[in-house]
């Protein structure tokens, strides 16, 4: 039962990551050589690639978060973005995004129990005409739920992590900037704020215990390479990425001061590598600390962890435009 469940979960997550995370058609595309880099069409085209490249990766991780209070068989997250507007004619882009995180426990029958579902919209707007030193802003609105509707608390007053309801809605705004030098390297940074606004519905028992307001930031360095020697190829792909992500809860938390980093800080350092023989999948290693576990109703868990596995979603940059 355990082997069969793991195989099914692993295969589904990997196939979905490649098929939907990139949302690329396999049909022949009508392409034309890119216009000069100072053209508006090329600027919008390149920024649409930045929006995709700077997303989080889908991943699968055998044994999940090593160091977590619970033991896992395999964990993973599937991230799929469907760009409704991503035209070379517009500096505005809009995507509908779904994020599905599942942790398969080592308990009898390997239950997943309370997976995390996040469904929302992302809006991107280009601020600069520079494609080597870029700047843009992003706004998000997401609904986050664990798909349960049971009582949030057990009779003894503790959180019901098996069937307890967890849901919240948040808006997020970030300022994003970075560098991109084809065939060599690039960097990406962002600063922003996530707010679980009280005007939206959320589950009971979260006020004073959950990070409703978070300052967040990210720093990324990536190595790039042509897929083939010039002048044959106009495509550049990532070979390695190093990412530092951090967020800090700034709202009132009962029993915790504003400087209590052990409860308010989430931080992750990840190294990602894509082999030359792979199109968009690679391996990764992450070390981090959760002062608030992002896995829905398990938010009270605090722990340091290591995560190893396979990731999908590396972006390829092209100097060709769709007609």
Regions found by a protein language model. Give the residues of each.
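Cleavable N-terminal export/targeting peptides
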Residues: 1-40, 318-323
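Short glycine/proline- and aromatic-enriched beta-strand/turn motifs that initiate or cap beta-hairpins
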Residues: 23-84, 311-315
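Predominantly the C-terminal beta-signal and adjacent terminal strand-loop region
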Residues: 25, 253-255, 260-323
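Outer-membrane pore/translocation modules
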Residues: 34-54, 87-263, 291-292, 301-304
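Short alpha-helical segments and helix-capping/turn motifs at coil-helix boundaries
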Residues: 76-82, 122-126, 268-270
């Amino acid at each position: 039962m355990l082997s069969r469940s793991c195989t099914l979960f692993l295969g589904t997550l990997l196939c979905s990551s490649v098929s939907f995370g990139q949302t690329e058609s396999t049909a022949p595309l009508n392409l034309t050589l890119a216009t000069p880099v100072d053209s508006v069409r090329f600027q919008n085209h390149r920024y649409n690639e930045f929006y995709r490249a700077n997303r989080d990766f889908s991943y699968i991780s055998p044994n999940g978060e090593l160091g977590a209070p619970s033991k896992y068989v395999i964990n993973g997250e599937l991230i799929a973005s469907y760009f409704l507007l991503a035209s070379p004619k517009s500096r505005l882009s809009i995507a509908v995004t779904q994020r599905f995180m599942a942790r398969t426990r080592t308990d009898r029958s390997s239950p997943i129990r309370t997976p995390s579902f996040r469904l929302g919209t992302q809006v991107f707007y280009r601020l600069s005409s520079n494609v080597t030193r870029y700047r843009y802003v992003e706004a998000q609105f997401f609904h986050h739920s664990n798909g349960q509707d049971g009582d949030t608390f057990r009779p003894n007053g503790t959180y019901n992590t098996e069937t307890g309801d967890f849901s919240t809605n948040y808006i997020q705004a970030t300022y994003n900037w970075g560098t991109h030098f084809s065939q060599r390297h690039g960097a990406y940074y962002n600063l922003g704020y996530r707010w679980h606004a009280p005007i939206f519905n959320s589950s009971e028992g979260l006020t004073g215990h959950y990070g409703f307001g978070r300052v967040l930031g990210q720093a990324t360095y990536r190595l790039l390479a042509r897929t083939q020697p010039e002048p044959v190829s106009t495509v550049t792909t990532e070979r390695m990425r190093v990412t530092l992500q951090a967020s800090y809860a700034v709202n009132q938390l009962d029993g915790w001061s504003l400087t209590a980093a052990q409860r308010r800080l989430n931080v992750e350092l990840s190294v990602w590598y894509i082999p030359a023989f792979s199109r968009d999948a690679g391996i990764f290693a992450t070390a981090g600390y959760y002062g608030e576990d992002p896995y829905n109703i398990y938010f009270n868990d605090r722990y340091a962890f290591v995560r190893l596995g396979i990731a999908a979603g590396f972006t390829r940059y092209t100097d060709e435009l769709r007609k």
